[in-house]
C-alpha cells in the first residue's frame, strides 16, 4: 500500500479512485492530479513506480487535505459560533443552517425524537 498524505491508499484500485480515499480529494480533483503528474487515471497503484508515487505525493501536497482541512473546517465553524451570527447559533443548537423547514423534517440534524414530558 502506498502512503500519501498520511493515508494508506489501496493498491488494487485505479490511481484516480485510490486518491479519493484522502479526505479533501474527490473524483474531479483526483483526475486533475493524475493529469498534472502525467499518470494515467486508470493505472493501478501497485503498477506505479516509486518515482510516480513520489510525484503523486508532491502534487497532493499542494492542496489542503486530511488533518489541515479538518482543522480548518472546525475552526471556521467555531469562529461562526463565537461571532454569535445566525449560522453560528444554528450550529450551536444543532439545527439546519440554510433555511430548511424544521417543523416536520430535519430529523437527521436534530437527532431522534424526544418524548413529551408532562
Swiss-Prot record:
- Family membership noted in the UniProt record: Belongs to the universal ribosomal protein uS13 family.
Q: Describe the task this protein carries out.
A: Located at the top of the head of the 30S subunit, it contacts several helices of the 16S rRNA. In the 70S ribosome it contacts the 23S rRNA (bridge B1a) and protein L5 of the 50S subunit (bridge B1b), connecting the 2 subunits; these bridges are implicated in subunit movement. Contacts the tRNAs in the A and P-sites.
Q: Which biological processes are named by the entry's GO terms? A: translation
**UniProt-listed InterPro entries:** Rbsml_uS13_C, Ribosomal_uS13, Ribosomal_uS13-like_H2TH, Ribosomal_uS13_bac-type, Ribosomal_uS13_CS
Q: What is this protein called?
A: Small ribosomal subunit protein uS13
Q: Which organism is it from?
A: Chromohalobacter salexigens (strain ATCC BAA-138 / DSM 3043 / CIP 106854 / NCIMB 13768 / 1H11)
State the UniProt keywords alphabetically.
Ribonucleoprotein, Ribosomal protein, RNA-binding, rRNA-binding, tRNA-binding
GO annotations of cellular component type? cytosol; small ribosomal subunit
Which residues lie within the region annotated Disordered?
A: 94-118
Presence of the UniProt keyword RNA-binding in the record: yes
- Give the coiled coil ranges: none
